[in-house]
Amino acid sequence: METQNHTTVTEFILLGLTESSTLRVILFMVFLGIYTVTLVGNFSIISLIRSCPQLHTPMYLFLSHLAFVDIGFSTSITPTMFKGFLGNRLVLSVAACIAQFCITVTFGTVECFLLAVMAYDRYVAICSPLLYSTHMSPRICFLLVGASYVGGCVNSGAFTSCLSILSFCGPNQIDHFFCDFPAVLKLSCSDVSIIGIIPSISAGSIIVITVFVIAVSYAYILITILKMRSTEGRQKAFSTCTSHLTAVTLYYGTITFIYVMPKSNYSTAQNKILSVFYTVVIPMLNPLIYSLRNRDVKEALRKAIIRIFP
């Protein structure tokens, strides 16, 4: 009988986006700019909503939490990318890798639930305006936000529980810029036949549930808008939804390709590009989408600028 000696892996090497030192410098500058805009934009949204009484409504409460989640989502990955750009290689311990993935999944899942909550909020505001204060009371808003964070933690716990029971005794190079579940799973020497389908089941279930809420909400919204006789009323109703629909399309479209579609449909390079888009670019775009396409936010921003620079 042959005895195979396995060395337990205690750390992973993340290969990042490129091996070219020149490209790493360029990418560092690009992502530094993106991360700066992400922080400034989302912190500005949070500060603006907190400081402007006219934005103290459920819709903007949810938007402020979305901005906070985008900050956490981007921060869970981008600073680690900077280390990889500035060094020859990025090394993370197994525990640090699992922790990074845990945080990333938490914020990513919370964003899914918040987008669904925001769709429900628009449904109540447009379809049942007289009952809005009752259906979206401070207590209900608190419960909806709290449930979003709890859902994120539960989903993250399921993923990290699977990772924590895996053994790693072979190659330790992850062909990615962060510790994503499929990339880490490839390096395990444990039986992953069951664990390997968990990302699609878990992410797919959350996507189906939240997309169902969003789709039903907007179906009723569309019916209500089409029944409106006033053109101005239609335009106002549409204007409150376009920003949210844009954010939903960008986010759900990307994560569906990554975590639900069969991996044979796209290459590792394409996976990295899509991952960059939803983990780094979208958190930067959300505050721009909501500020540039929202009259209330633009007006509050104008007043805030006047107060600062009279």
UniProtKB/Swiss-Prot annotation:
Glycans are attached at N5, N265. The keyword Cell inner membrane does not apply. It is a multi-pass membrane protein. GO terms for molecular function: G protein-coupled receptor activity; olfactory receptor activity. Its main location: membrane. GO terms for cellular component: membrane; plasma membrane. Residues 1-25, 76-99, 155-196, 259-271 are extracellular. It comes from the Eukaryota. Pfam families: 7tm_4 (PF13853). Disulfide bonds join C97-C189. The keyword Disulfide bond applies. Keywords: Cell membrane, Disulfide bond, G-protein coupled receptor, Glycoprotein, Membrane, Olfaction, Receptor, Sensory transduction, Transducer, Transmembrane, Transmembrane helix. Residues 47-54, 121-133, 218-237, 293-310 are cytoplasmic. One of its GO terms (biological process) is sensory perception of smell. InterPro entries: GPCR_Rhodpsn, GPCR_Rhodpsn_7TM, Olfact_rcpt. The chain crosses the membrane at residues 26-46, 55-75, 100-120, 134-154, 197-217, 238-258, 272-292. It is found in: Cell membrane. Potential odorant receptor. Belongs to the G-protein coupled receptor 1 family. This is Olfactory receptor 5P55.
